[in-house]
């Protein structure tokens, strides 16, 4: 299996989370898994080359990204119904509820994505980061000293929380600035049908890919939308520079 490294990374994260919560506070294992799953969702969305190599293709990274996002919602809903309001401050509970409402709303928007403009959908999708921050406030306000004193649990939760925050910050504020190392020029543009275009691009340096994978392209020419869009890749003339 070519994506074994990526799958081992996901499985190891969940196993470590389960073992840590089971040995310290087993009653909070569900929200603990939700936090790890959310952090993994942000990490997978960074499109880092390392992750792409681990999963053997960006399309496989996004398949797992969708899985962890869906799993996060299921865990959060289950947590909300099974433990909501049992303990903790009113403000902490409000942060948690607000985070869940935002997550669910964005999931609904995702299903309506094909009916709204991509740029609008992309900005709405970024609200997930705000919900994640609300969720972290909820967790740390609820757990108190358990997560503020150094131990295995606080190290695990803090590590994944920090990775999730850094990943989200990178996606929203840094991705379009420091990414896109491959420059190219469009050499041919062909309309295949009413909603499909074939674009041939000559790159400034070789780019290894396989037919059927996809990549994000950004158009720098003035007058065009600057947001990166995903495009399917075809092995045109079996060249890696076009």
Model regions: which residues?
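Membrane-embedded alpha-helical bundles of multi-pass integral membrane proteins
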Residues: 2-168, 183
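Short boundary/loop segments of OB/S1/cold-shock single-stranded nucleic-acid-binding domains
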Residues: 167-179
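Ferredoxin-reductase
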Residues: 178-242
């Amino acid at each position: 299996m070519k994506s074994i490294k990526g799958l081992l990374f996901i499985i190891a994260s969940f196993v470590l989370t389960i073992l840590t919560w089971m040995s310290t506070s087993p009653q909070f294992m569900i929200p603990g898994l939700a936090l790890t799953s959310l952090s993994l969702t942000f990490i997978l969305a960074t499109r880092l080359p390392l992750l792409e190599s681990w999963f053997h293709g960006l399309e496989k990274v996004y398949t797992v990204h969708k899985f962890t996002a869906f799993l996060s919602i299921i865990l959060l809903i289950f947590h909300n119904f099974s433990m909501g309001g049992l303990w903790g401050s009113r403000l902490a509970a409000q942060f948690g509820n607000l985070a869940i409402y935002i997550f669910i709303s964005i999931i609904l928007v995702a299903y309506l994505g094909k009916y709204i403009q991509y740029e609008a959908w992309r900005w709405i999708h970024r609200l997930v980061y705000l919900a994640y921050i609300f969720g972290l406030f909820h967790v740390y306000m609820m757990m108190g000293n358990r997560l503020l004193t150094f131990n295995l649990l606080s190290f695990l939760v803090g590590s994944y929380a920090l990775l999730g925050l850094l990943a989200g910050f990178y996606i929203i504020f840094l991705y379009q600035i420091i990414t896109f190392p491959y420059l190219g020029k469009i050499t041919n543009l062909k309309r295949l049908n009413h909603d499909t275009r074939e674009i041939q691009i000559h790159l400034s340096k070789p780019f290894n890919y396989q037919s059927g994978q996809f990549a994000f392209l950004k158009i720098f020419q003035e007058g065009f939308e600057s947001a990166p869009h995903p495009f399917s890749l075809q092995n045109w003339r079996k060249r890696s520079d076009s």
